């Protein structure tokens, strides 16, 4: 039940803070977020690490070179406050990256 609530909260935060194409996952301990093609998730990760937010870039889950604009974020060990803060930071950095392009 706790993880179900965290999952629902994480999806809500992702939709609120992150400009996304789609959010994948049907529950569990992580969500997969697909961004616009112009956002490189590895570059996004480099910037997020500096603000203490980490995730797995999506391309590691593909063998065909796809997924460069996606990421998987786990939240099992994070509080609701940390989940919201993390998604807010990711969203801020994506907006900065879009302004740079």
Task: Describe the residue ranges of each PLM region.
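Preference for bulky hydrophobic residues occupying beta-strand positions
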Residues: 14, 33, 73-75
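Surface-exposed helix-capping loop/turn segments at secondary-structure junctions
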Residues: 15-23, 98-101
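Alpha-helical structural signal in soluble globular domains
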Residues: 9, 13-17, 47, 93
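Conserved glycine-rich beta-strand-loop-beta hairpin in the small C-terminal domain of fold type I
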Residues: 2-11, 21-34
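Conserved C-terminal alpha-helix-loop-beta "cap" of PLP-dependent enzymes
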Residues: 33-71, 85
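PLP-dependent enzyme catalytic core of the Aspartate aminotransferase-like
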Residues: 50-51, 65-101
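Short, contiguous acidic/charged loop-to-helix segments that flank catalytic cores in large enzymes
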Residues: 1, 21, 33-36, 62-63, ...
């Amino acid at each position: 039940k706790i993880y179900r609530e965290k999952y629902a909260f994480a999806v809500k935060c992702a939709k609120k803070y992150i400009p996304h194409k789609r959010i994948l996952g049907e529950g569990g301990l992580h969500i997969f977020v697909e961004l616009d093609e112009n956002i490189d998730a590895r570059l996004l990760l480099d910037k997020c690490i500096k603000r203490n937010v980490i995730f797995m870039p999506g391309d590691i889950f593909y063998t065909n070179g796809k997924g460069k604009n996606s990421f998987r974020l786990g939240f099992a060990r994070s509080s609701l406050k940390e989940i919201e803060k993390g998604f807010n930071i990711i969203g801020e950095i994506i907006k900065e990256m879009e302004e740079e392009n």
